[in-house]
Amino acid sequence: FFGSLLSLGSKLLPSVFKLFQRKKE
């Protein structure tokens, strides 16, 4: 369970990071 959650998080993190960078600009 935790393994799939970790892989899902690693996939979502980059997109969330990009969204945060866009809001900063």
UniProtKB/Swiss-Prot annotation:
Keyword vocabulary terms for this entry: Antibiotic, Antimicrobial, Cytolysis, Hemolysis, Membrane, Secreted, Target cell membrane, Target membrane
Keyword Protease: no
Localisation per UniProt entry: Secreted; Target cell membrane
Biological processes, Gene Ontology terms: defense response to bacterium; killing of cells of another organism
Gene Ontology CC annotation, any one: membrane
Classification via InterPro entries: Antimicrobial_4 (IPR012523)
Tissue note: Expressed by the venom gland.
The keyword Membrane belongs to this UniProt entry's keyword annotation: yes
Family label: Belongs to the non-disulfide-bridged peptide (NDBP) superfamily. Medium-length antimicrobial peptide (group 3) family.
Primary role: Amphipathic peptide that shows antibacterial activity against E.coli (MIC=12.5 ug/ml) and S.aureus (MIC=12.5 ug/ml). Has hemolytic activity against human erythrocytes (25 uM provokes 83% of hemolysis). May act by disrupting the integrity of the bacterial cell membrane. Increases efficacy of antibiotics (ethambutol, pyrazinamide, isoniazid, rifampicin) when tested against S.aureus, probably by facilitating their incorporation into the bacteria.
Protein name: Css54
Species this chain originates from: Centruroides suffusus
